[in-house]
C-alpha cells in the first residue's frame, strides 16, 4: 500500500462483543484513521463495532463511506450520519464494492460475516487479483486461535510461507497502519486477472 493510500476498509462485528476492549479498539482505529486523513470504507451500519468505528471517524472530522445491502437497510441498521452510503442488492456486490474502493483492509473482532469479508480480500491478494495489504488487529487476544490455525495450516503444507506472511498482525492501531503503509506485495505468481474474480 503506498504511503499516500487514503481509503481503508475495516471489517468488524455488528455486535459489540463481550468485552469493552473491542469497542475501545474500534474507536481507536476510527480516531487514527481520521487523524491520518484516511477515508473509512465499511459495511454502512450504525450497530455494534461498526457503529462505534464510524462514529469515531466522524467525530475526528474524517470521511466515511458505507456500503450496505437493501435487506439490511430495510432492517433500519444503516448509519444515517454518513456522507456516502451506497445501497446494493447482494452481499457479493457489497464485498466487491468495498474491495474496489479500498487501498487496504483491516479486520477487527467479529463473527462469520467479518471473517468472510476479510478472507475473501486476503485470497484476492494471494491470487494476485489485487495488491493491497490485509491486516488483523488482535484485540484482547481475540484472534489468537485464528492466527494459530493459520500457522497450523502453513505447518501442514496448506499455506505457503509467503502467503502466511501476507497477513499483517498487531495490537496497536497506529503501528498496524504504519506497517500497512510500508507493506510491499509478495513476489508471487499472479494467478488471476481482476476481471476473473
Positions of predicted regions on the chain:
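A cross-family phosphate/adenosyl-ligand binding-site feature
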Residues: 1-102, 118, 139-174, 178-179, ...
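N-terminal glycine-rich "phosphate-gripper" loop used for MgATP/nucleotide binding
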Residues: 88-89, 110-112
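Hydrophobic acceptor-binding patch used for acceptor engagement in glycosyltransferases
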Residues: 105
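CoA-thioester-processing core
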Residues: 124
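His-Asp phosphorelay/catalytic-motif detector in bacterial-type signaling
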Residues: 130-132
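Conserved beta-strand/loop subsegment of P-loop NTPase cores
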Residues: 135
Amino acid at each position: 500500500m503506498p504511503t499516500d493510500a487514503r481509503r481503508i476498509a475495516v471489517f468488524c462485528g455488528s455486535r459489540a462483543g463481550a468485552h469493552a476492549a473491542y469497542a475501545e479498539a474500534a474507536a481507536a482505529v476510527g480516531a487514527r484513521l481520521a487523524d491520518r486523513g484516511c477515508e473509512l470504507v465499511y459495511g454502512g451500519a450504525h450497530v455494534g463495532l461498526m457503529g462505534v468505528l464510524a462514529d469515531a471517524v466522524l467525530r475526528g472530522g474524517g470521511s466515511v463511506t458505507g456500503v450496505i445491502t437493501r435487506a439490511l437497510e430495510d432492517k433500519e441498521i444503516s448509519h444515517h450520519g454518513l456522507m456516502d452510503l451506497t445501497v446494493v442488492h447482494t452481499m457479493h456486490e457489497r464485498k466487491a464494492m468495498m474491495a474496489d474502493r479500498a487501498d487496504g483492509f483491516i479486520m477487527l473482532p467479529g463473527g462469520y460475516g467479518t471473517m468472510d469479508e476479510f478472507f475473501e480480500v486476503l485470497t484476492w491478494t494471494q491470487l494476485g487479483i489485487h495488491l493491497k495489504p490485509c491486516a488483523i488487529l488482535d484485540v484482547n487476544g481475540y484472534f489468537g486461535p485464528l492466527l494459530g490455525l493459520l500457522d497450523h495450516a502453513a505447518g501442514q503444507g496448506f499455506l505457503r510461507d509467503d502467503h502466511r506472511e501476507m497477513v499483517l498482525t498487531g495490537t496497536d492501531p497506529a503501528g498496524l497502519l504504519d506497517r500497512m503503509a510500508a507493506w510491499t506485495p509478495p513476489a508471487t505468481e499472479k494467478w488471476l486477472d481482476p476481471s476473473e474474480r
